[in-house]
Amino acid sequence: MNIKELHSQVKPVSAISLFKSELGNATAIQILQGEKLKEHITKTPALLICIEGKAVFENENGIKATLLSGDYVTIEPMVKHWVEGIQESQLVLIK
């Protein structure tokens, strides 16, 4: 199995549940080049890992991180954030 195969190429941003348990979950996210996961918040701390591609994570506190394959960023709860696909990107969000 491959994370990339979970997503359709036609959606600019795609989020598919990868794993769920009573204690947390993982979501596979694909962002196509030039597209953006729009501004939103999370109620729980999260970890965003870049599997493939290049994306930029930003939040309302001025944090800006370029994510390449293997890079990750922690996401604070109740802080607006967004992610832009500089290249087609495969990411995993763990909460």
Predicted regions and their residues:
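A short, N-terminal "cap"/entry segment at the start of jelly-roll beta-barrel domains
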Residues: M1-L23, T27
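A generic "binding-loop/recognition-motif" signal
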Residues: G24, Q33, K43, I63, ...
